Regions:
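A short pre-motif secondary-structure segment
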Residues: 129-133
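Internal acidic/polar
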Residues: 85, 92-119, 139
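Arg/Lys-rich amphipathic alpha helix in sigma70-family domain 2
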Residues: 66, 77-97, 160
């Protein structure tokens, strides 16, 4: 009986997440998802492919979303996993992208353009944490769920990344 109630709840959620709501989510968050995938993929075309595939997966698996409040972190996790999976399939990992592809001036809201260079010099796992926490505003708990690592690990890696960035001055 308990299973039927759970299934009924999922069906209700699936019906409640309309294609229009999903389209609104995509319109609002697509830029963040592309930048997140770009942080992993390092190529705009690959990042776009990863996001497109992740959004398809999210739509197909929308009944697995337990709470609409968690949609942003849930889709971000799917995007990260899809981008990493695509790299593994191609057996190609590029760690550093040419700085020519980065803006030479500060982006709106980020007055210190030099920090972008310093962030890019971090190890990939540290850079991903910095982007998720400081740039995209995910909580440490959400990052823990997205990357499948303990919250304590997120905290310690963020601390270490902050120390590295402070020492780069």
């Amino acid at each position: 009986m308990h299973w039927k109630r759970a299934q009924k709840g999922r069906n209700k959620l699936r019906r409640s997440l309309t294609s229009r709501q999903f389209e609104q989510f995509v319109a609002t968050e697509r830029g963040m998802l592309v930048r997140l995938a770009m942080n992993i993929q390092h190529h705009p075309e690959d990042a776009d492919d990863a996001v497109a595939e992740a959004l398809c997966k999210a739509w197909e698996r929308r009944e697995q979303l337990r709470s609409p409040d968690k949609m942003r972190s849930w889709v971000a996790k799917i995007t990260v996993n899809t981008a990493l999976s695509m790299i593994q399939k191609r057996k190609r990992v590029e760690l550093v992208e040419s700085m020519d592809d980065y803006p030479t001036t500060a982006e709106p809201g980020y007055p210190h353009s030099g920090i972008w260079h310093e962030i890019e010099s971090l190890a990939e796992q540290d850079r991903t944490l910095v982007y998720l926490y400081y740039i995209y505003g995910f909580s440490q708990k959400e990052i823990s769920a997205i990357l499948n690592i303990p919250t304590g690990t997120v905290k310690s890696r963020l601390y270490a990344a902050r120390q590295k960035l402070k020492n780069c001055r």
